């Protein structure tokens, strides 16, 4: 464990990607294969393989108490350490220095065993006892990184893609082979073992091991979107939960964008998905659905996180699964095939009698109108259209919004499915009102009827490895949501300043705003004008929030639009 902590320090000390990869590769070569496999997990910010359902379920408040107990530090000293470092792992190093053991006796195998024990028990008290046992044996630098591993906030400027590069470098393998194997097995540790034994080619796709989702890049206008592709498929952008459905003859599992198993939250989808009678992996969206129309996302949120969904809840918030892509079929992974071919294969899975959302007019243009759905017909093929001009895209965009959907997805018909990556092969055209996915970093007590309730949220975008505050919002959520969030934030407070609390950066929210402005008030250098919360993004993790670069893009685009309007105005004035 000591050498891994030292390696993490070395990685954090350089900003050069090539140096980070070289440091990791050298470290991996110095370890046994089992040790190296465990290390790749931890270096990727995980305690268990991506495909595993196990999690530690340890909040910052538990770690705060444990570190305080071991160090003997007062609440004031703990708070000062956290304020100074802005990171619980670094604060741990500060308060345990001179208190923790000087000699290292902790092995990676023992760390892995303790993580398994922590995941297996329930309740803060039981988890705290195990964490005390683990950290009590660690040196201060080791404790720093153990805390970071537990929180999943490593923050050393290392991505899993760079760990893949290090594996390729350490064992002399082709990077493309390493990446493909990791995508297939869903376990960076197992990928290392295959690379070490020159068996990457034996990696096989396994059902019920979720893959990363292909993500879209925002487009600012129909003109921009249309200019990207000569030939594209156009679909509605749904306001639901992105979900990957794995189906065999006797089993169905549904995974969220964060690769969590959410099958139990949607039991009525299981028989409908089983009826497909093919071994497949589908990509799609779960929608709250009634009377042939998608309901607001706030309705769908009522279903999230429930292990036992009552019949009454199923009636109140009925759901359907709208599928728009095929990743695996007939024992083969099809992600490398062009979208047009995958779409044709997906069409073939849906027999003539199966429910469909596409009504084709005499000109062969999909109308994008929704069909009525019976309770037994909960799996639907997403409608697709083609657009021959930006004006046609605008028409389809307006029609999608009339149906209560967010906007449009525009997809290159020749594109492969880029697992876990965002690119310009898929574009998303959303509402004209600008939006960002941000993470809550601090909360404040409200006023008036919300006095005493943590209802004002400060939020951040990601700038490299840092979270940079960019705004504050207090409107948009229901009273019920605010009450639930108040409870969560109190349980996950890192630093309590009285009126304001710094909280674990875990809650992702989608905020809308009118403009991005330059500002010295926030660390990002920007502020959002008239921000309001659209929804809580339970389906997204903190690593998926928007970046500072994205905020800068919106700012520049506003500037260019203003410049064009001014130019048009000047031209009109001169002509008159």
From Swiss-Prot:
Listed SUPFAM superfamilies: ATP-dependent DNA ligase DNA-binding domain (SSF117018), DNA ligase/mRNA capping enzyme, catalytic domain (SSF56091), Nucleic acid-binding proteins (SSF50249)
Chain sites annotated for binding ATP: 235, 242, 257, 285, 324, 422, 428
Family the entry assigns: Belongs to the ATP-dependent DNA ligase family.
Organism: Koribacter versatilis (strain Ellin345)
Gene that produces this protein: lig
Keyword Cell division carried by entry: yes
Gene Ontology MF terms: ATP binding; DNA binding; DNA ligase (ATP) activity; metal ion binding
Record flagged with keyword ATP-binding: yes
Role played: DNA ligase that seals nicks in double-stranded DNA during DNA replication, DNA recombination and DNA repair.
Cofactor(s) essential for the protein: Mg(2+)
EC number(s) reported in the record: 6.5.1.1
Active site, renumbered: 237 (n6-amp-lysine intermediate)
Keywords, in A-Z order: ATP-binding, Cell cycle, Cell division, DNA damage, DNA recombination, DNA repair, DNA replication, Ligase, Magnesium, Metal-binding, Nucleotide-binding
Stated name of the protein: Probable DNA ligase
Catalyzed reactions: ATP + (deoxyribonucleotide)n-3'-hydroxyl + 5'-phospho-(deoxyribonucleotide)m = (deoxyribonucleotide)n+m + AMP + diphosphate
InterPro entries in the cross-refs: ATP-dep_DNA_ligase, DNA_ligae_ATP-dep_bac/arc, DNA_ligase_ATP-dep, DNA_ligase_ATP-dep_C, DNA_ligase_ATP-dep_cent, DNA_ligase_ATP-dep_CS, DNA_ligase_ATP-dep_N, DNA_ligase_N_sf
GO BP term, example: DNA replication
């Amino acid at each position: 464990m000591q050498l891994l902590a030292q390696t993490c320090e070395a990685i954090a000390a350089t900003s050069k990607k090539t140096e980070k990869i070289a440091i990791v590769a050298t470290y991996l070569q110095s370890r046994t294969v089992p040790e190296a496999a465990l290390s790749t997990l931890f270096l990727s910010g995980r305690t268990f393989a991506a495909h595993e359902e196990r999690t530690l379920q340890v909040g910052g408040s538990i770690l705060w108490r444990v570190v305080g107990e071991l160090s003997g530090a007062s609440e004031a000293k703990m708070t000062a350490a956290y304020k100074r470092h802005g990171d619980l792992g670094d604060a741990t190093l500060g308060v345990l220095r001179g208190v923790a053991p000087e000699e290292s006796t902790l092995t990676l195998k023992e760390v892995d065993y303790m993580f398994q024990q922590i995941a297996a028990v329930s309740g803060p008290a039981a988890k705290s006892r195990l964490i005390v046992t683990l950290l009590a044996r660690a040196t201060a630098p080791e404790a720093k990184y153990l805390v970071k591993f537990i929180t999943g906030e490593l923050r050393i400027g290392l991505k899993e893609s760079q760990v893949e590069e290090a594996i390729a470098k350490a064992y002399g393998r082709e990077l493309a082979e390493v990446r493909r194997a990791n995508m297939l097995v869903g376990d960076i540790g197992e990928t290392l073992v295959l690379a070490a034994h020159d068996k990457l080619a034996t990696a096989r796709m396994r059902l019920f091991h979720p893959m990363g989702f292909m993500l879209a890049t925002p487009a600012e206008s129909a003109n921009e979107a249309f200019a990207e592709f000569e030939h594209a498929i156009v679909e509605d952008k749904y306001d639901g939960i992105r979900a990957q459905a794995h189906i065999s003859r006797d089993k169905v599992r549904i995974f969220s964008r964060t690769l969590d198993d959410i099958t139990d939250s949607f039991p009525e989808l299981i028989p409908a998905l089983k009826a497909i009678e093919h071994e497949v992996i589908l990509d799609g969206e779960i929608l709250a659905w009634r009377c042939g129309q998608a309901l607001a996302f706030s309705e769908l949120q009522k279903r999230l996180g429930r292990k036992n969904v009552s019949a009454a809840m199923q009636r109140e918030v009925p759901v359907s699964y709208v599928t728009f892509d095929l990743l695996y079929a007939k024992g083969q992974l099809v992600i490398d095939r062009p979208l047009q071919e995958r779409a044709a294969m997906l069409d073939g899975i849906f027999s003539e009698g199966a429910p469909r959302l596409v009504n084709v007019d005499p000109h062969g243009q999909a109308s994008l109108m929704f069909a009525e759905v019976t309770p037994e017909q909960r799996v639907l093929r997403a409608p697709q259209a083609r657009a021959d001009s930006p004006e046609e895209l605008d028409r389809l965009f307006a029609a999608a919004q009339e149906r209560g959907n967010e906007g449009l997805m525009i997809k290159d018909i020749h594109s492969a499915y880029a697992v876990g990556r965002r690119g310009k092969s898929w574009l998303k055209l959303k509402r004209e009102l600008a939006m960002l996915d941000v993470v809550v970093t601090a909360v404040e007590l409200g006023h008036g009827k919300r006095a005493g309730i943590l209802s004002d949220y400060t939020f951040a975008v990601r700038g490299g490895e840092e979270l940079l505050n960019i705004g504050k919002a207090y409107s948009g959520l229901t009273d019920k949501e605010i009450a639930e969030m108040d409870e969560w934030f109190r349980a996950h407070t890192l630093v309590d300043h009285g009126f304001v609390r710094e909280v674990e950066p875990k809650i992702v929210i989608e905020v809308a705003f009118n403009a991005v402005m330059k500002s010295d008030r926030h660390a990002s250098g920007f502020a959002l004008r008239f921000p309001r919360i659209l929804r809580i993004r339970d389906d997204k993790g903190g690593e998926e929030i928007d970046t500072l670069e994205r905020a800068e893009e919106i700012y520049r685009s506003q500037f260019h639009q203003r410049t064009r309007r001014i130019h048009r105005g000047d031209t009109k004035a001169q002509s008159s």
